[in-house]
Amino acid sequence: MCSSDLAGLAAAQQLVRQGHGVTVFERDDRLGGILRYGIPDFKLEKRMIDRRLEQLEAEGVEFATGVEVGRDLSIDELKDGVDAVILATGAQRHRDLQLPGRELDGIHFAMPYLIQQNRRVAGLPVEGPEITAKGKRVAILGGGDTSADCLGNALREGAVEVHEIAHGPTPPGEREPLKTWPEWPVVMRTYAAHQEGGQREWQFVTDGFEGKDGRLTHLVGHRVEFPGYAETGVRKPVPAKGGEVLLEVDLVLLAIGFTGTEEDDVYVQSGAAIGERGTVEIDAGYATSTPGVFACGDAVRGADLVVTAIADGRQCGAAVHATLA
């Protein structure tokens, strides 16, 4: 099993309960993947992860931390002596912005910030250049779970002010009549972090960044309107009159999603086909294009919910068992 992330742990438990020997390789120093270093403690207490890991160990799952498959251990070495390899490494290739000033110091992807903050809370050393919101004016670009996680962390660190910025129209309080099931409901979502503070901004387009001596000082943007959106559901933004904005900031966190799996050596060595969405292609039995190599979770589906990854991991484990039986 490559990765102790959500889907990997679920698949491991499914297989060990069927009598298979399972070893999970994790590149980080501790187990849990995004549960450990991505989701903040105020949403998920780490003792809950540790309790599940203790259960898995008691059931017979073996773990190896600090081992990155593809670098510390090649796929060929891994396949030698095992019947199946499962890739469950997630989808953490960041979506970026190509805007003027993007290179300025003070602009970071959200996940490195969340990882560092999780390590701080756990009393662990922080790796790489420090990313902190303490005493800073923060802008978070994005409007989903990750941006809310950044907001909660920034407030807890003692940020001077925090803006969560989204370019889409202000969501309605109730589901739109034109957006019926199974389409994703476009409604106002207020997370616990939003109730703690910060300012939420919609209909705000970021145009670039300004700085001094290589350091970020301002976010440049403009406000937009969506004429007829409430009646038609069609998004056609037009600049709002007098809507230019120059926002004084010290830290910008990009929480605008992910574009697929990371371009790791494990995928190059495995030969597993990667589709147009940047995720691993599989058949109905979770098998990749390489015999003996399977994949599941966000590595296949793209960034998704915790419960979805767990369900996918269990289904993958059942499919691998059926193949090996």
Residue ranges and their predicted role:
Residues 65-85, 121-128, 211-245:
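Conserved beta-strand-loop-beta-strand element in the redox core of flavoprotein oxidoreductases
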Residues 103-135, 228-303:
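FAD-site-proximal beta/loop scaffold in flavoenzymes
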Residues 147-151, 157, 296-324:
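A conserved FAD-binding loop/helix module that cradles the flavin
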